[in-house]
Amino acid sequence: MSFLNTIRGLGRGSKKNKKDLEPSNNAIYSHSNLSGNGLRRTQSPTKFSPSKLSSKGAQGSAAYTSSPTKRSRTGQSLQHQDSQSSLQYQQQSGSVSPSKRSSIQTTKSTTVNADPPLFLCEPYVKTALVKGSFKTIVQLPKYVDYCEWLALNIFELFNHLNRFYGVIQEYATPEAYPTMNAGPNTNYLWVNSSGQAVNLPACQYIEYVITWVTNKLNDQSVFPTKNGGAFPPNFIKDCKNISRQMFRIFAHIYHNHFDKIIHLSLEAHWNSFFAHFISFVKEFNLIDRTEMEPLLPLIENFEQQGKITQASK
């Protein structure tokens, strides 16, 4: 793993610069089917500007009343407040920022004896690029600053996720995926600048997330890279929000595009990457287990295989 073979620049020395944070082309999840160009801290990975995305998302938003961090399912509903902040698209300034509130609405599905999703079927569920647990490579190394380690890993993981999404992006059309769903029973909604929850096409939701995360990573006041820069008091909160939105992209791809991943012979890379991501967010408590529900059967399967360390009881 390129970013784990060296922790160059983590000491916040005078030689540290943005080039140290750029991903290597020899990263473990690199593949001939993936783009060779990694995300740079000064580049936006989106094809559309935030202002264009905003104008697209504004149409018809008045018809929706749900929260962007809600997970809706058919059947009986249950609602509770979540302390994590949801994302809010700022149409006035053309940028994305988190809102101060979010809620989760869950309902239990009455569907029984349904066929398991493809990613839970043999042999795909056991396919992996790396064997063994990822715990040892996500743990905080000795003499490394806690926030530096979080920042470096989030940057690397987001870069890899963005590249994987680029592989299946052409299939994620608004017509094919009119909602940001993670299976038939889970749907993610987006809170706009007016506080309204809108049901966006998956591609637009993901573009909003990518734009927001990219802006965070490029913001020196949030993810400082210059010598002497201090991490802000809400840095951990930003890490949690970024990790939560990254998980939703994982969930959408697993439930809707895993067949394309298989067709491109990337299932081993994808499974190992997801196991790595979950190991990292579990190690630093960045995502609540309730938020992982759309992929919880897969996570528990990986735990049984030893790819992810099970939580101590």
Swiss-Prot record:
Instruction: Look up keyword Cell cycle and say if it applies.
Output: yes
Q: Where is the composition biased (Low complexity)?
A: 76-97
Give all Phosphoserine modified positions. Answer: 44, 51, 67, 97
Keywords of the record, alphabetical order, are: Cell cycle, Cell division, Cytoplasm, Mitosis, Nucleus, Phosphoprotein
- Any one Gene Ontology molecular-function term assigned to this protein's record: protein kinase activity
Its family? Belongs to the MOB1/phocein family.
Superkingdom: Eukaryota
Q: Where in the cell is it found?
A: Nucleus; Cytoplasm
Q: Which InterPro entries match?
A: MOB_kinase_act_fam, MOB_kinase_act_sf
> Which one GO biological process term can you cite for this protein?
filamentous growth
Assembly notes: Interacts with protein kinase CBK1 to form the RAM CBK1-MOB2 kinase complex.
List, alphabetically, the Pfam families matched: Mob1_phocein (PF03637)
According to the UniProt entry, which residue ranges have a biased composition of type Polar residues?
23-69, 98-109
Q: Which organism is it from?
A: Candida albicans (strain SC5314 / ATCC MYA-2876) (Yeast)
Name of the molecule in the record: CBK1 kinase activator protein MOB2
Say what happens when this gene is deleted: Leads to hypersensitivity to cell-wall- or membrane-perturbing agents, cell-separation defects, a multinucleate phenotype, and loss of cell polarity.
Q: Where is this region: Disordered?
A: 1-109
Example GO CC term: the record gives: mating projection tip
Q: What is its main location?
A: nucleus
Describe how it is modified after translation.
Phosphorylated by CDC28 at Ser-44, Ser-51, Ser-67, and Ser-97. Phosphorylation occurs during bud emergence and is maintained until the G2/M transition. Dephosphorylated at the end of mitosis. Phosphorylation is required for the maintenance of polarisome components in hyphae.
Organism lineage reads as: Eukaryota, Fungi, Dikarya, Ascomycota, Saccharomycotina
Q: What does this protein do?
A: Functions as an activator subunit for the CBK1 protein kinase. Part of the regulation of ACE2 activity and cellular morphogenesis (RAM) signaling network. The RAM network is critically required for hyphal growth as well as normal vegetative growth, and for polarization of lipid rafts and the actin cytoskeleton. It play an essential role in biofilm formation. The RAM network also plays a role in serum- and antifungal azoles-induced activation of ergosterol biosynthesis genes, especially those involved in the late steps of ergosterol biosynthesis.
Give the SUPFAM superfamilies listed for this entry: Mob1/phocein
